[in-house]
Amino acid sequence: LNNHTNHTPPILLTIAGFDPSCGAGVAADLKTFAAHNCYGVAAVTALTVQSTQGVISVHATPSATLRAQLDALVDDVVIAGVKIGMLTNRGNASAVTEFLDKYKFSHIVLDPVFRPTAGNAELLDTSGLKFVRDELLKRVSVITPNLPEAEFLTGMEVKDVAAMKVAGQKLIEMGARAVVVTGGHLDKPTDVYCVGTEVETFGGDHVKSPNTHGSGCTFSSAILAQLASGQQLREAVILAKAYVTKAIEKSYQIGKGAGPLNQFFRFHQEQPLRGVHEVPQHGMHPAAEPAAH
């Protein structure tokens, strides 16, 4: 066997926090990249204390350390796209913005994480939120806020599809190139897609499952993987939405709270073993074989 003909997959970078339960953050991103035949690398913005029951506390990575992680990665590998999640503070948001300005990546997806679904920990401080809104927003290919995140960014109430459309257009006016306002919190999961003056709604099947921990991370990472694989943005969003729906449907009940998605639902069929075979006993112990006469 040799690997001389193996094709190097797109290398995708996630810049986000670490979740010890591995349902969200960089763990969810890396699983999603792998499930889309991409190779993931990560720069960690924070260590969190959390489980499926919620976020207890957040410990931000020093900005100098975050910069060092980013520099080490870009010095070593060719990055095809960047996904940005939790940033924790203005210093880290500024470090990431400088990084994007320096290297001009083709595909950048921002999942603007401000507060956890469960728990009261702050995932981005007020100064950081303002910086994301004023500076980072205009530098990314697409931003994927859920309803509470859209409210944080726009300052308006976002409770239904009509308000989602207004919020999406407002984010475009604020400098975003493209927006997907995700409506997983609604009775009928509907996403609103905005590019320029174009506004579309994408409906989906409602999956009755409490296991949605990391769904936003998975969705944004799936969009990036599709973009890096050659899809146009609209198609990437549709494919990512279908993927997340199935990953929730096939999710795991792990822990006492909201369990994680199953990013690897496509790989559940047992694969034949290649390159592994039983070695006959006589081949293992030649000294024990009877001498020939």
Predicted feature locations:
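Conserved N-terminal subdomain of the carbohydrate kinase-like
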Residues: 2-14, 26, 30-122, 267-270, ...
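Conserved phosphate/ATP/ADP-binding segment of small-molecule kinases
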Residues: 124-199
